[in-house]
Amino acid sequence: MAPSPQQDAILTLDGVVAGYGKMTILNGVSATIRRGAITTVIGPNGAGKSTLFKTVFGLLGVRTGRVTFDGADTTSFEPRRMLDAGVSYVPQGRNLFPELSVRHNLELGGVALSDTSRLAGRMDEMMARFPMLRDKANAQASTLSGGQQKLLEVARGLLLEPKLTLIDEPSIGLSPLMVQEVFSILKDLRSAGVSILMIEQNARQALAISDYGLVLEQGQTRIEDTAQNILADPRIAQLFLGGGLAPATSETSR
């Protein structure tokens, strides 16, 4: 069941403009990401989805507009400050050190923890939550399957107990069975109180486990609604077939 409209926001974007060099990718994105929910961002290639995540996490500067996380203005925050504030980021693709062990790769997610006892405790918690990582703790990361590597990246992102996790295309290169496992873990994280903002190419499957959805096109928010309503919107089928979205109506766009 989707959270109520009164549920408070953990992240808001207000007219955010960002890009690379002279190229503008995000052209006034506004959105509200609800606390304790899974929100999936979809849209055609080049819509600005990954750029949105990089901007929220502080990897890319905001030219104009405002980003607010958990009630604080984080528009100018760099990645380390976003980590400290409670945001983790799992980028697209493989982002592990293949020659290091599973345990060492996981420990790298806790570089911001100065308390070694707390780090040890969080490591134990992650090993318990992800039994596969415990069983392969001393194996090189390069020996893991694609799905296992993705689970390791997710676990590493959770080591600092984030309030919000940004996950970019978690299903890329995974078998259908492993995709189901990853999505099941995301649902468990939501139940544990972690807010999740996800980009996913398998939009229908992702929206099926999501509470909310956000459709981007040409660097702008075109639809922001419950996942259920987006799944039922006939314009989404046109988007998936490669066409643009028709002008949004007041019933499904806000």
Where are these regions (language model features)?
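ABC-type ATPase nucleotide-binding domains, specifically the catalytic core motifs of the NBD
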Residues: 21, 39, 61, 102-121, ...
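The feature captures the beta-strand-to-loop junction immediately N-terminal to the Walker
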Residues: 42-44
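Helix-to-loop junction immediately C-terminal to a conserved catalytic motif
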Residues: 57
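Conserved ABC transporter NBD signature motif
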Residues: 65-73, 85, 119-123, 225
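Conserved ABC ATPase signature
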Residues: 140-144
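ABC ATPase C-loop
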Residues: 157-158
